[in-house]
């Protein structure tokens, strides 16, 4: 395909948001520019419930540090303009993610395998997958001792002691950051989880959102 002058592709929409697609994105965008992209938020094929996108592309005339192209979301027929930057691995929301990843590393998660972890068990819980009537979010709840194989729910363990009031403020701030992030990226920033355009967040990204929230709150206090 890399020898083509251009064409049309139909692929999973996670191509634009998944960290694991980094090398594929780099190879593609080092060679091609996208002309226009359609994103489908409903099931399009019988054999898969995953959301897909289609886009037309052409071979680059010159190497560039960023590309901008129109995106239409179906069936809503909403039109957006999307910019992807090379320095952020051509990833949707890459600039924002870089800021999040640069936050101090303060959190891990509580597991049955390590019920007495080094650090402080909090009441901060992350629900990592959108539900039908509830988006992925942070909440305050009793500690959940998860399995090593868990991917959807976790209680955070902090390297610093946090009052319950501070934990509640972190939850509120982190949820606002996630809401703003999804809005700014037209809800294309997190990877899709199976059907109905549901999104998911990995534990490491969740830790980073919580850490950035704490850092912003402490900066405000100072």
Model-derived segments and spans:
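A generic alpha-helix propensity feature with a strong bias for hydrophobic helices
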Residues: 15, 73, 78, 107, ...
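Short amphipathic alpha-helical surface micro-motifs
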Residues: 17-20, 34-39, 103-104, 108-109, ...
């Amino acid at each position: 395909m890399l020898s083509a002058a251009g064409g049309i592709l139909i692929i999973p929409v996670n191509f634009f948001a998944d960290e694991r697609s980094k090398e594929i994105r780099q190879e593609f965008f080092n060679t091609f520019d996208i002309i226009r992209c359609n994103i489908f938020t409903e099931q399009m094929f019988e054999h898969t419930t995953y959301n897909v996108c289609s886009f037309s592309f052409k071979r680059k005339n010159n190497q560039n540090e960023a590309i901008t192209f129109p995106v239409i979301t179906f069936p809503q027929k909403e039109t957006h303009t999307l910019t992807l930057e090379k320095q952020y691995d051509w990833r949707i929301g890459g600039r924002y993610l870089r800021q999040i990843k640069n936050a101090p590393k303060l959190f891990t998660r509580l597991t049955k395998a390590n019920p007495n972890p080094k650090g402080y068990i909090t009441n901060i819980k992350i629900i990592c997958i959108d539900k039908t009537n509830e988006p992925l979010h942070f909440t305050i709840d009793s500690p959940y001792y998860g399995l090593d194989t868990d991917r959807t729910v976790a209680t955070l363990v902090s390297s610093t002691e946090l009052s319950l009031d501070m934990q509640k403020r972190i939850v509120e701030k982190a949820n606002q950051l996630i809401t703003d992030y999804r809005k700014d990226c037209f809800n294309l920033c997190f990877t899709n989880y199976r059907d109905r355009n549901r999104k998911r967040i990995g534990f490491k990204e969740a830790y980073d959102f919580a850490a950035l929230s704490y850092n912003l709150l402490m900066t405000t206090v100072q």
